[in-house]
Amino acid sequence: MIMHKGKTIYLSSVTVDVESARKIVELRNGDVQKKFLNPTKNSIEDQLEWLGNYLERNKNGDEFYFFIKRIDTDEIIGTVRIYDIKRDIDSFCWGSWILNERKTHTAALESYLLINKFAFYHLNYQNSHFDVRKDNSKVISFHKKTGAVITDDDEMNYYFQYT
């Protein structure tokens, strides 16, 4: 199990089990969270099947999925994922970034730093690409402040890149 520790949170690899599937469905279906995520089925069985397929992608080094947990309570407060790895341009996408209302004050910044540290320094990627829903103004502002550049957009999303 991969773990990366910050000041108030840590990242722990998602496991393929019913409890993980249940927690992901719960996190993805919060009123605020689901507004900015791709729609998924609310079924634990469907999520468990998706996690089984994810495990194969993870074994191939094509995807990494983490729970974000509080250090003080070990409570799962979110998720973050690396996927859409483009080896030809040495880039990874990160997303499925969810934090619930029980997050720590610094959980967003810490999880952002930890996922990038993992991808840039552990996996040795040189670039990052990702998309953000246009109506998710807080996250857009966050990424602009951290140096991400908008490279494209469509009706729904802005596409960002770090180089």
Where are these regions (language model features)?
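A short helix-loop-beta-strand connector motif used in the catalytic cores of GNAT acetyltransferases and
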Residues: 54-67
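Conserved beta-strand-loop-alpha-helix junction that forms the acyl-donor binding cleft
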Residues: 129-140
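Conserved acetyl-CoA-binding loop of GNAT-fold acetyltransferases
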Residues: 144-154
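Conserved beta-strand in the GNAT
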Residues: 67, 74-84, 93
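A short, well-structured alpha-helix characteristic of acyl/acetyltransferase catalytic modules
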Residues: 1-48
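C-terminal "cap" of GNAT-fold acetyltransferases
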Residues: 153-163
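Conserved acetyl-CoA binding element of GNAT-fold acetyltransferases
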Residues: 83, 89-101
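Conserved acetyl-CoA-binding loop-helix of GNAT-fold acetyltransferases
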Residues: 105-118, 141-145
